[in-house]
Amino acid sequence: QHETNHETELITLRRARKYRRSHFSFSFVRNPFDRLIAAYNNKVIENEEPPQPMQNMGVTHGMSFEDFLDVLIETPYKQYDVHVLPQSQLLCIGNQIVPKFVGRVEQINEHWAELRDILARQGVEVMESLPQKNVRRRDRGGLQDYFNSDALIEKTLQIYGDDVRLFYNDVSVDHL
């Protein structure tokens, strides 16, 4: 069970799978490269002290991005802080995606409209559009500063390869 800062209840995947027949579940995933950079910048660079779960992993304030990746590679997923845990670990049992609908943050308006249509057919009304929160990067420029070698891309794929394969299989890694 991973912490969500007491903002939401994060149920286990097995419990979610039990609800799958009687409930409609959905999730939005984020480009794993963007998500990784956001976690690194916020938790390692901006915060004076990384969250305790990250400290337990060996993450320290101001460590280099490559050292951060090495810590992630060396740490078993069960010890990950939720901010860096691969989304496939949160949303899948094996390679089975538990939510019935998975949209992408990068296409949130389009995918939200699609989800709204699905929910409307089931008699569920939801807001017309979603509020913009925690928007940090609107262009692709910021990623190249971090992923400036094939080795760093490979290390990232070693951790988040399942996320790319399951949720971004129609997008070239060069375009993530």
Outline where the language-model segments fall:
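Membrane-interface amphipathic segments in extracytoplasmic regions
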Residues: 1-176
